[in-house]
């Protein structure tokens, strides 16, 4: 009986160690990309362009979904990666996007952002 309790405890600890990191960051890059997809044309547009309403809806949805520090860091890393893959990215528009959508995020959307410093 004592041996089976030890095995059960060991199994529980192993499950906690394996599952905990997966639960930390609930946001995937797929989710971030889907929310931000309507913004690509704005991010490639000349300065002073206005983001389309579906873009701002995606920005607000992403902000609402990023409720923890790991979520915000995951979103930041996904945005940083996406910014690096958009041809002809207008970095001024990328940096201005949250403000133009009426929200505030604690970092600049840029390929040089240090996402490890992002906190909730």
Swiss-Prot record:
<dbReference type="InterPro" id="IPR016140">
    <property type="entry name" value="Bifunc_inhib/LTP/seed_store"/>
</dbReference>
<dbReference type="GO" id="GO:0008289">
    <property type="term" value="F:lipid binding"/>
</dbReference>
<keyword id="KW-1015">Disulfide bond</keyword>
<dbReference type="GO" id="GO:0006869">
    <property type="term" value="P:lipid transport"/>
</dbReference>
<dbReference type="Pfam" id="PF00234">
    <property type="entry name" value="Tryp_alpha_amyl"/>
</dbReference>
<dbReference type="InterPro" id="IPR036312">
    <property type="entry name" value="Bifun_inhib/LTP/seed_sf"/>
</dbReference>
<feature type="disulfide bond">
    <location>
        <begin position="56"/>
        <end position="101"/>
    </location>
</feature>
<dbReference type="GO" id="GO:0050832">
    <property type="term" value="P:defense response to fungus"/>
</dbReference>
<dbReference type="GO" id="GO:0042742">
    <property type="term" value="P:defense response to bacterium"/>
</dbReference>
<feature type="signal peptide">
    <location>
        <begin position="1"/>
        <end position="25"/>
    </location>
</feature>
<feature type="disulfide bond">
    <location>
        <begin position="29"/>
        <end position="78"/>
    </location>
</feature>
<keyword id="KW-0445">Lipid transport</keyword>
<comment type="similarity">
    <text>Belongs to the plant LTP family.</text>
</comment>
<keyword id="KW-0732">Signal</keyword>
<feature type="propeptide">
    <location>
        <position position="120"/>
    </location>
</feature>
<feature type="disulfide bond">
    <location>
        <begin position="76"/>
        <end position="115"/>
    </location>
</feature>
<keyword id="KW-0813">Transport</keyword>
<keyword id="KW-0020">Allergen</keyword>
<comment type="function">
    <text>Plant non-specific lipid-transfer proteins transfer phospholipids as well as galactolipids across membranes. May play a role in wax or cutin deposition in the cell walls of expanding epidermal cells and certain secretory tissues. Binds saturated and unsaturated lipids, jasmonic acid and lysolipids. Has weak antibacterial activity against A.tumefaciens A281, C.michiganensis VKM Ac-1144 and P.syringae VKM B-1546.</text>
</comment>
<keyword id="KW-0295">Fungicide</keyword>
<protein>
    <recommendedName>
        <fullName>Non-specific lipid-transfer protein 1</fullName>
    </recommendedName>
</protein>
<dbReference type="InterPro" id="IPR000528">
    <property type="entry name" value="Plant_nsLTP"/>
</dbReference>
<keyword id="KW-0929">Antimicrobial</keyword>
<keyword id="KW-0044">Antibiotic</keyword>
<dbReference type="GO" id="GO:0031640">
    <property type="term" value="P:killing of cells of another organism"/>
</dbReference>
<feature type="disulfide bond">
    <location>
        <begin position="39"/>
        <end position="55"/>
    </location>
</feature>
């Amino acid at each position: 009986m004592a041996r089976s309790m030890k095995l059960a405890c060991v199994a529980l600890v192993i499950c906690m160690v394996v599952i905990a990191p997966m639960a930390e960051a609930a946001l995937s890059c797929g989710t971030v990309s889907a929310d931000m997809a309507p913004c690509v044309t704005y991010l490639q547009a000349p300065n002073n362009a206005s983001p389309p309403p579906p873009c701002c809806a995606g920005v607000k949805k992403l902000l609402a979904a990023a409720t923890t520090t790991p979520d915000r860091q995951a979103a930041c890393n996904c945005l940083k990666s996406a910014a690096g893959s958009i041809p002809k990215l207008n970095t001024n528009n990328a940096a201005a996007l949250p403000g133009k959508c009426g929200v505030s995020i604690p970092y600049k959307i840029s390929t040089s952002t240090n996402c490890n410093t992002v906190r909730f």
